Amino acid sequence: QLPEVEFGLGSTVEYTFVYEKTRIQITDTANERNTGDQLMLIRFTAPSPGVWTFLIRGARVFPESIFDIWLAPQQFRSGELFFLVPDPDVTLTVPSYTTDAVTVTFFNSENGSFYYRSGRGFGRTGEIKPDLAAPGVEISTVNGPYSGSSMAAALTAGACAQLMQWCVAENNYSRISGRGIQTFLSRGAREQTQEEYPSRRWGYGQLDMRRTFDE
């Protein structure tokens, strides 16, 4: 068990254990540069197997205070590491929460199901993200089929280019902006009848360019 940690502005503390090889480094950032919120990074080296529990205290921790915690991406972790009670929501990554960016999750276009490895919204402070969902499972490429958010992002980028062609090159709406593209795609997104929208998984629905132009 570690003693209670007290932080100064931007301080880092490190702990070792007498009978274990585990080393823990905790870095406190009083103001995270993108949000202004407090950020704490906890790094484990050679962690001992078992359940690790963190107790948060502070002079200004109120009943309505919200604490969010995430694991590092799987490719940066070693061994089996997971939360006992995980929450799949609020798992979009930077820069997904940029206001004017078109943010997409991905789904299987063969059966219409949301893909379990895709991130989900909303934002920590309630921002409506993602904007929509795009196909991202077993997408055909010159190197074979691939799955992932990068596939959905690429398809959506192509949709944005198609919309820009119609708006600017064909002079239908030459003043289109990034926010405007976001709005057009969201309005044209196809909803699933069983979902409440905007959705943490689907945003405003599935990417549908025909419906976007019809709208």
Which stretches of residues belong to each language-model region?
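Carbohydrate-binding/catalytic loop surfaces
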Residues: 201-215
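Charged/polar, solvent-exposed surface patches and flexible loops
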Residues: 97, 183, 187, 211-214
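Extracellular S/T/G-rich loop segment that most often corresponds to the catalytic His/Ser-adjacent loop
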Residues: 1-2, 6-31, 84-165, 211
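Broad hydrophobic/π-residue packing in well-ordered secondary structure
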Residues: 50-53, 117, 143, 204
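Residues that cap or initiate secondary-structure elements
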Residues: 48, 60-62, 123, 138
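Beta-sandwich interaction modules
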Residues: 18-59, 67-72
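Hydrolase catalytic cores
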Residues: 1, 136-200, 206
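Long, charge-dense accessory insertions within large macromolecular proteins
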Residues: 62-88, 106
